[in-house]
Amino acid sequence: MCTLHRQWLRFIIAAVCLISPYLVSAADETVLTREQIKHFLLSAKIVSGKQSTKGITQPWRLTLSDGTLTHDASFQAIDEHKTNVTMASGRVEMNFVDSYKYNIAAYALAELVGLDDMLPVYVERSWHGNAGSLSWWLPAKMDEADRIKQNITPSDPDAWNNQMYKVRVFDQLIYDDDPNLTNVLISEDFKIWRVDFSRAFRLYKDLRNSKDLVRCDRSLFEKLKTLDANELAAKTKGYLSKDEVKAVMARRDKIVSQFQEMISEKGEKEVLY
């Protein structure tokens, strides 16, 4: 019995030794700050890559490792500039741009308005000779298109709606010309992340769909009101042009104005949460 016990003990210790690195990695991931994630994305070695078949731009799923932590990331290198493009709707868009740079700009803007927890961390990095955006791979269970198709109801409808209100405000702020349900990712516990902004930041100063502005988080509303053009320009230097920054600020003004009008009509409690 003692011999058998010792054999089982050795087996258990060996199993723990094999499993523990994965447990440590998982634990490390949960406590990484966003600055630590940025550092990892910028400096960790890219050990492998596989191209995705999902999405128009078909980003790459890369595996990175710094010797301690191994994690995947999404790499998008598209940077197209065309005189005009006929969209799927039949509309012709002049000065068409589809660029990875807008992913980085979107994250920078999200940091300024306090929504960076709803986007993956984006940085600029080169791979195989191509510059692109590299973002932290998210633990998503599905996207919004899947959720609707499968008729899945969020476990907490109020919390879900509050997240979606934020996404809608952000979408109006950045004027994404290619918003689609696959760009809203959902975790096991129904946390929402908004991804892929390569066709955002159009030069339009009007809102894309003002009816999407239903309610607004109080903190987000305050940060929108204090958003500074010079700070935005500095934080997105190299990723947004002066005209694109001006367009963001013009849309910001209209978003704030619309919510202020709604507050006057309905009362603050009906609009802000």
Language-model features: locations:
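Bacterial N-terminal signal peptides
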Residues: 12-21
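Phosphate/dinucleotide-binding and metal-coordinating scaffold of catalytic cores
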Residues: 25-273
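Helix-centric, low-specificity signal for extended rod-like, repetitive segments
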Residues: 1-3, 244-245
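Bacterial N-terminal signal peptides that target proteins for export
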Residues: 2-12
